[in-house]
């Protein structure tokens, strides 16, 4: 990986920069390359990893070749840049938007409202294994009438990443991670008591990452950040649950002194602490674990991932693909078949996992190459293949896997990045000012968030 951030955090930065770029109407969307070449349907697709990620690029290019061999009537023209905010808006404005394009889970609602994606409701019905995809993920790509505009290919939910060695040193059972925030607080006390600068629990509080994590905290307590009130969105976090979350954070920071003195942290700061063996726990998705190993000299066996403490909810995110609204029926059909074959294909589970094993990449995490987008028998099939080929201690993440089916996941609020910027200030106040007035912080944030939500169309 070329970045010290996990894919989850890199997607956050992409969305932050993209937030102002999805404001163009359907007239700005082109149809990509020509309709056909030599009798073939030619489609342009995003998702090709950059050359700085040689393993991922190699897998993608090999998949394109295999797909074209098995689908001689379809010609794939792959494009890099699916995470490049510098080109996304320009492509929309210049009519160069690909036929099949990547989106983050926060994007579909606005894209659909602005008619920047094709209606694939009927075309998707014939896709193999369509009924095995988790319906709550598909719902993220539907409009108010239930019409479908995209397919999910990867998802994550926030949980708790923790240091198994520090748990053991502190007399805690690493196979029984905290399930409530009170248990997190108690564990943080024992870990911080180890001394030598050891921090029990850390959290983000700048560059919108603080607001992102505060949203996850609120979900875990059973609160919302925004709710629909008739035809408009309104803030929904000036409540006792939000106050309880912030009071818990304040208590850990100031009463317990388990969060360290250095604050205004972001992802790479916290990952560096965990990789150095100086941090007990932090909130994150499972894709953080490979980053800790590859970029911060960690070991897979040293980390566990638990479900979101509190169990009343968690932040759900992910990615998927949508189709250019000007694409012909032939291109829509070809594009959906590419997405299904490449990303949503149980028949290729074993081969895809083997690609990772052969490339000495981690297998066993609840993340790529086995994204948790399936339900029922197909999910069981995927879990069995993952267990068969696991080259990392999958049992360390079992708590997270077990909780994923019972903890409700909620996607991010509308205009998420603007909301997060406001909530950053709340996190910063609580973590840097012992006397911060939580009621005032929430009241002020609600007023500002309502102004942001009023812009949602």
Feature roles, as predicted:
Residues 80-88, 179-186, 261-275:
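Short helix-initiation/N-cap motifs at beta->coil->alpha
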Residues 292-298, 311-315, 322-421:
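C-terminal lobe and pocket-closing loops
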Residues 105-158, 213, 217-220, 302-304:
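Hinge/lid segment of periplasmic solute-binding proteins
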């Amino acid at each position: 990986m070329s970045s010290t951030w996990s894919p989850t955090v890199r997607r956050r930065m992409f969305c932050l920069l993209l937030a102002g770029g999805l404001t163009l109407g359907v007239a700005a969307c082109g149809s990509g390359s020509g309709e056909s070449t030599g009798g073939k349907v030619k489609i342009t697709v995003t998702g090709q990893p950059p050359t700085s990620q040689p393993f991922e690029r190699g897998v993608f290019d090999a998949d394109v070749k295999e797909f074209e061999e098995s689908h001689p009537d379809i010609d794939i023209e792959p494009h890099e840049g699916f995470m490049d905010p510098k080109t996304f808006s320009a492509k929309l404005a210049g009519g160069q938007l690909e036929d099949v394009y990547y989106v983050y889970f926060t994007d579909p609602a606005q894209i659909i409202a602005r008619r920047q994606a094709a209606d694939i409701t009927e075309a998707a019905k014939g896709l193999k294994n369509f009924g095995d995809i988790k319906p709550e993920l598909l719902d993220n790509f539907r409009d108010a009438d239930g019409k479908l505009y995209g397919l999910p290919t990867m998802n994550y939910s926030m949980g708790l990443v923790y240091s198994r060695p520090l748990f053991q040193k502190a007399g805690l059972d690493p196979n029984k991670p905290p399930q409530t925030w009170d248990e997190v607080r108690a564990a943080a006390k024992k870990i911080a008591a180890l001394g030598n600068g050891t921090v029990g629990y850390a959290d983000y509080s700048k560059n919108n990452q603080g607001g992102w994590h505060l949203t996850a905290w609120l979900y875990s307590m059973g609160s919302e950040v925004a709710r629909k009130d008739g035809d408009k969105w309104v803030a929904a976090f000036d409540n006792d649950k939000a106050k309880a979350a912030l009071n818990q954070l304040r208590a850990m920071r100031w009463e317990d002194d388990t969060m360290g003195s250095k604050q205004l942290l972001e992802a790479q700061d916290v990952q560096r602490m965990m990789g150095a063996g100086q941090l007990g726990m932090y909130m994150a998705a499972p894709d953080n674990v490979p980053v800790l190993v590859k970029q911060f000299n960690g070991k897979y066996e040293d980390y566990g991932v638990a479900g979101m403490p509190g169990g009343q909810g968690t932040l759900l995110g992910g990615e998927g693909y949508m189709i250019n609204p000007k694409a012909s029926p032939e291109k829509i059909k070809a594009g959906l078949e590419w997405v299904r074959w490449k990303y949503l294909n149980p028949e290729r589970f074993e081969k895809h996992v083997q690609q990772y094993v052969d490339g000495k990449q981690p297998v066993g995490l609840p993340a790529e190459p086995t994204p948790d987008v399936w339900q029922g028998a197909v999910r069981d099939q995927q879990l069995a293949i993952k267990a068969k080929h696991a080259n990392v201690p999958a049992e360390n993440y079992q708590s997270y896997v077990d909780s994923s089916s019972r903890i409700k996941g909620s996607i991010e609020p509308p205009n998420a990045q603007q909301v997060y910027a406001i909530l950053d200030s709340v996190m910063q106040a609580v973590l840097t000012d012992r006397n911060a007035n939580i009621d005032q912080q929430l009241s002020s944030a609600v007023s500002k968030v309502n102004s942001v939500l009023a812009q949602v169309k």
